[in-house]
């Protein structure tokens, strides 16, 4: 027997849900239309005013990419020249501009998470936004909160932040604010449950020898999707994000870019998202179906790259003309796109792209792939870096986690002989950008691989920075960057005052395989003989310091407690200032204050939550059952009584801190926001007209492979090229999908990020934090809540901050808990509720160092 979504979800309170019980994604129609609520009001009105002047083909032009490698950006829509609206330029990545030049390479999202610093997250976002804007880019394809990081070996975890939804949500939102305050539309991606690279695309899987009919399905219950994977996207919507990218995977066997439950219900009806949903590149699988399910923009426009075919473009024009897609739906798409454009002030900053993603040549054809159009200047070589190296260097240092320190750090600079050991300390012999999309692990790891990358303007290696430091102090420094030269390593380590050993572990996007790792990591071990390299040094030098550059946790059990391993640092993926950032920490110019954004287990088995690496459904879509529910990372370790080597939130400092004086105060806060019980009717703007209004303009020189909105003739069937044109829509259009009448507002909806009551501040918590050491440093107070239910995690992170304190200085850190912070998702009520179970608050320096705790008073 297959259960309904709600029945299956309800079972998770007491049991594990089977694959069959999660095999269905319930329909939700019609697609909610934007209404300009909250901070969107002005942008919405401007969007309505301009869209009201557009013809149908002009609206369609905004919704459909012009094709892969046709124009300068990785994605570009058509424009509306008649109204002085250029095509939108969309460009990767979450850590800087991909396929460009004279831009910065920022630290990855996982490093931002390690800072636990809201202000730094904002400043990084703002700096990236400035660079994108200066290059003529309208939409940055980032940041990412999907993957969240369900499995530690997931290939693209590093593009996001942390497997904790609260930590991710806060830093996700701050990044978005920074990008959009710089005048660029941010894209929250990949929505949703995009937690592994294996089987994410049919053609990609075929390249690795797997014959599947459809992409992997992430099968999840209603409670888990709300409390874990949707949580950071709610923060993004509340922050005003302009765009959301839907993902390649299926959710409960319905594709992410045509899943009416996740797009229409969760995103637009519950969270009140007012911006536009774009497809990931190649994630668009239908025309009418995706339009009615809530997709607003097709990227890059063609069905497969350079196929000259599109589910939208001409076919979307036809679908509106023949009534299959109602006018209000395409109007809503256009309004959402233009509202996002106006909200960030892009109209004031707009300029055409001044670079080409496809060539570094100064001159070339305007339309790259077909080599057609005017021959013109395509690269203007605009330097957009400003002074961003400063925030990059600071973020790199402030994200370096001191995992272990037996009084070995900081270095004094007086060390007579310094050994630098490991390939990860040095340069890529091919050059910093020598591997396309960073698809190799040569030299120091400062950025992982895939589309989520940027070109380095330069890369300061650890070897370069440390050598400069040692020579400044008249010492001696030697480097061995061959991880297999163990005999030479042993000899040098015996002579050294300190041995700095550099190791790494890489991962990335599934279209690139590095050393047999097809995007996802094959394991959590160090790459390139790293464990043996460390042991060779530690067995011969009593002051061995290990530096790890990695995309996530690695297994350190073989050597972390070696008596000669005196310190361990995790530096993540620190970007272009890698060596300088590290030297700042090693030599004490920066006191490390970072905290691990994930758990370091003793074994891979300790994490559970294995990736699906082999077919498990014949040649059908592989099935990935999220049967662990909300118990990932530290939540799972706590549930299974697994003792980690380093817990979530752990990180040492060159000073010490004390936490005391926990105080709790109930607040009489209540939202004054009036939430309507029903929406208005779906608005329409302008007239549709007739087929004769939308045939190709006379005299137009068509560009090969370019995706246009026009018709070849007034014969809609002939223009569509669809052999199934004319089938009975009653059999294929879901019930209610075209209904533009007023709709009920969901109990969990009614505002940006959900019902405004969720954000009522119910309890104030204050704690005294004191620097008890002899140097200034950063404390990161962490507040966790026990929600009390018998099947809830032991604790869940809810609040945090990063505080700089001088020696002996103390401060009172105050934060508030909202209704959302204290609630669980009720699958029967389809709403957030504060349960009657007793709740506690815990405060300390990590998920397992929580000296302060108290019962919370009951609130509603």
Swiss-Prot record:
Report what the protein is called.
Answer: Beta-glucosidase 1
Q: Does the keyword Hydrolase apply?
A: yes
Q: Which InterPro entries match?
A: Cellulose_deg_GH3 (IPR050288), Fn3-like (IPR026891), Glyco_hydro_3_AS (IPR019800), Glyco_hydro_3_C (IPR002772), Glyco_hydro_3_C_sf (IPR036881), Glyco_hydro_3_N (IPR001764), Glyco_hydro_3_N_sf (IPR036962), Glycoside_hydrolase_SF (IPR017853)
Record keywords: Carbohydrate metabolism, Cellulose degradation, Glycoprotein, Glycosidase, Hydrolase, Polysaccharide degradation, Signal
Tell me what reaction this enzyme catalyses: Hydrolysis of terminal, non-reducing beta-D-glucosyl residues with release of beta-D-glucose
Write out the GO biological process terms: cellulose catabolic process
Q: In which pathway does it act?
A: Glycan metabolism; cellulose degradation
Q: Which domain of life is it from?
A: Eukaryota
Return the SMART domains for the record: Fn3_like
